[in-house]
A protein has these predicted regions:
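Conserved nucleotide-sensing/catalytic segment adjacent to the nucleotide-binding pocket
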Residues: 59-112
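Structural recognition of the conserved hydrophobic beta-strand(s) that form the central parallel beta-sheet
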Residues: 73-75, 106, 122-133, 147-149
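Flexible phosphate/Mg2+-sensing switch loops adjacent to catalytic phosphate-binding sites
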Residues: 41-65, 105-106, 153-162
Length: 221
């Protein structure tokens, strides 16, 4: 969520931005964990979440093309409960978001006598985060994701801290932090983002094995 403020700068340099996948068993607190962080991008309004299984495709396309830095959150990504055509559309949306590819849809032109078809283009550039109960199985999507597993055991002993943050999620300290990040993102120089990433890649290289470092198909932003 903090990196989303720099989405456009990251895409400018590397033509890519990874997706975030939060997955785990029912009751692990996936949505309740995501919501406070999403308030870095919202102040008094509640963050918008879209059900991947309960919506038609066009509202999802509209969401990922309306902003280049506001995270879009897809809930209820349950492949077993989705029709094949619907699942193919959602997976294509996720897969093409990594490189910010353009989506195109055909429609009938009602402004011209006799009709006719037109092709509308949409830039799939908003940072995407999706929530599900199982790890995404399609390798083309998985290799473009930062995967974050959660379980019920992760919540043990942390309820007081979580309740403190959750109760103050709307218009509170998390929103103020987000405003500070917006100001910093607007003031940052594009070259600083590039140089900082290069610096931390070198640090990462010195800390891990060669095999891990050379797995460049995994997102590292």
């Amino acid at each position: 969520f903090s990196a989303a403020f720099l989405t456009q700068l990251v895409r400018f340099h590397w033509k890519a931005f990874p997706l975030l996948q939060v997955w785990g068993q029912a009751g692990a607190g996936k949505t309740q964990t995501v919501e406070p962080f999403s308030h870095m991008h919202y102040h008094l309004k509640m963050p918008k979440k879209i059900s991947a299984a309960g919506n038609t495709f066009f509202p999802m396309v509209a969401a990922v093309t309306q902003s280049a830095s506001l995270p879009v959150i897809f809930e209820e990504l349950k492949p077993r409960q989705m029709a094949k055509f619907q699942l193919d559309q959602v997976q294509n949306l996720l897969r093409t978001n990594y490189n910010g590819e353009r989506l195109e849809r055909g429609s009938v032109n009602r402004d011209v006598a006799g009709g006719g078809t037109v092709v509308n283009g949409y830039d799939n550039v908003a940072p995407i985060m999706f929530i599900g109960e199982a790890l995404e199985s399609q390798s083309a999507i998985l290799e473009r994701c930062v995967s974050t597993p959660l379980s019920k055991e992760d919540r043990d002993g942390r309820s007081d801290e979580f309740e403190y943050c959750y109760a103050r999620r709307q218009g509170g300290p998390i929103s103020w932090l987000g405003r500070s990040m917006i100001d910093a993102a607007l003031a940052i120089k594009p070259d600083l983002v590039r140089d900082s990433v290069a610096k931390y890649r070198d640090l990462f290289k010195s800390k891990v094995s060669r095999r891990v470092y050379e797995d460049q198909n995994r997102p590292w932003h």
